[in-house]
Amino acid sequence: MNRSEIEEKVKHFLIEELEIDEDKIYPEARLKEDMNIDSLDFVDIVVIVDKYFGFKLKAEEMAGIDTLAQFCDYIESKVN
């Protein structure tokens, strides 16, 4: 799966599953501050990532991820 496909899937689940406004979804967007993703959303993200990408997110690995670009980097490192 290439980077573009990962970004499209992430964008899709942020809009469809978490109901985040499309205008808040851009590479430098901060997950908590700009997209208002809270701890309950992170629980949903664990399930969604498993569904879309086939692996389980680990909380300790997510701790250093602040932006959407970093999140996509993390997913890319796991699926490729």
Q: PLM features: residue spans?
A:
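Phosphopantetheine-dependent thiolation modules in NRPS/PKS and related acyl-activating systems
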Residues: 2-37, 41, 45-46, 51-80
